[in-house]
Amino acid sequence: VPLRNNYYLTIQMVNKNIIWWLSGIMLLGALFRLSIYNLEPLFMDSAYYASLGRSIAEGDYLLQVNHMSDKPPLFFYVQALFFQLLGVSASVAVLPSFVGGMMGIGIIYFLGRDLKNSAAGLLAAFLFAISPMSVWLSATGLIDSLFMAVTMLSFWTLLHRRYYWTGLLIGIALGMKQTILSFGPFYLLCLLILELHHHSGKEAFHSVTKSIFKMMPGFFIVFLPVLYWGMFLTSEKMKLLKWTTGFVSGKHDPQFVGTSLDRLSFLQSGLGEVVGLSWHWIIGLFILSMLLLMGKIYQQWSLKRQLELNDKLHFCYNLFTLFFFFLLLFVAQKYLAWYVFPVFPFLILTGSITLVELLNTRYLSWNRNARGKIIIGILGTITLISAFSSATARVNQIGEDLRNSPYQGVQEVIKVIKPYLMNGNSFIF
C-alpha cells in the first residue's frame, strides 16, 4: 500500500509539473502573438472576411449580401458572434484567429503526448507557440489559424476513436475552408490503421464501415446547412466543389502559375517559417524520422511482431506530409506563402517525436549509454535555443514589416472591391 501511495503521489507531481510547463508555453505563445496583434490594418482578404461577419452581426443572418468570397461561411459566423459579444472593430475581427492559435498550442500538446509521451507533447507545443507563421496567422484576420486548430482537434478525436466528434469537426473545418478536402486520404488511412490494428479480417472491414457511419451524423449537421447556403442563398450561387475543382483543373486559372522548380524554392522559404530555423533542419529531422520508423518496421518484421499503433500513425503523418508537398508543387494552380501552413503541425510533431526518440533509441551504437544521451541532450538543447532565437528574430521582423506597411484607406479598398459589391461603403470599419 505505501508503494502504491508513493506511485500515485509521483503521478500527481508529474501531472502538476506538466500543467505548469504547458501554462508557461501558452503564456509564451500569447506574448508572441500579442506582440504583433492587429498591427496591420485590415485589407483585402481580412477586411472582406470581417465585412461579412459584420453583415451577419447587423442582421443579415443568411449572409445574402452580394459578395465574392471563395470560402464557406462558418468563419464569418464566428466573427459575427465575437462582434455581437464585444462590438464591431478591427481588433475584434482578428480575435477568432488569435483564439485559434492559442487552441492549436494546447491541441498539439495532446497529439504529441498521445503519439509519443508528455515530453514530445510539450516540445511540440513550444515549437508551435513560437512558429513564426503560426504567430503571424494568429495575429491577422485570416481563417487558417482557427481552421488548423479544428483540424488538429479532429485528428485527436480520431486517434481516440471518437468518430461522431471527428465527423462533426471535419464538417466544421469544411465549413471554414475547402482545404480540408485534401486531408481526405489522410483521414481514411488513419481510420484504416486504427481499425486494422484493433481488428482483423472481415471484422476490420465491418468496423471501418461502422466507424464511417458514426462520423456521418456529426459531419452532415454542419455540411448540409453550408451546402444549402452555398447553392441557394448566397448571391454567388456556389456550385458544389466549384472552387476545389478550379484549384485542381484550372477552370478559373488555366495557367499553372510558375514552375514546380520555382515552387520548390518558395517551399524551402516557407519551411523556414515552421520554427524560424533553416529548411535544412526541418527536412533533416523529417528524413531522420523516416529512417527511424523504417528501422522499427524492419525490426518488428524480422521479429514477426506487430508494429506499435503510435508508430503506424506517425508514419502515416509523414506520408501525408509528402502527399501535401506533392499537391503544392505539381497540382495546385497557384502557390502562396501560407499554403504550406496545414502541414506545419505535422512537421512540428515529427521533429518533436524524433528529438525525444533520439534520447531513448537503441538503434545507434553511440547512444547505448548515459554519455550518448547527454550528447544528444546537449545537441537538442542547442537546437531549441537556436529555434527560439531565430523565431524571436523572425517575429520581430514580421512586426516591423507590419508597422511599416502602407496604410490602405477606405476609399482605396472600396475602389478595388466595389465592382463586386452591391453597397460599396458597407463592408469596412
Model-based region annotation:
Residues 107-110, 126-127, 136, 146-165, ...:
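Specific aromatic-rich, kink-prone transmembrane helix
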Residues 184-199, 203-310, 323-330, 387-393:
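Transmembrane-lumen/periplasm boundary regions of multi-pass, lipid-linked membrane glycan transferases
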